[in-house]
UniProtKB/Swiss-Prot annotation:
Protein name: ATP synthase subunit c
NCBIfam families named in the record: ATP_synt_c, PRK06876.1
Organism: Pseudoalteromonas translucida (strain TAC 125)
GO terms, molecular function: lipid binding; proton-transporting ATP synthase activity, rotational mechanism
Transmembrane feature ranges: 10-30, 57-77
Signal peptide: none
Amino acid sequence: MELVLGLKYIAVALLIGFGAIGTAVGFGNMGGKFLEACARQPELAPSLQVKMFILAGLIDAVAMIGVGIAMVLLFVL
């Protein structure tokens, strides 16, 4: 029984950790591409900024959903 609990804790930690790493990589890539696009075509910066913020919210939502799933695994199952 202790082995199952230990493995469950490791699974939850990996789920939250990899979700955070993936979110950070996604934000970094998106920010870099946004800056490149604004440097190439400055007149498109306002519309690109709106799209970037929408995508940032979606990327962040993926990490929050991962934390929610991890909490269900930790406390319910």
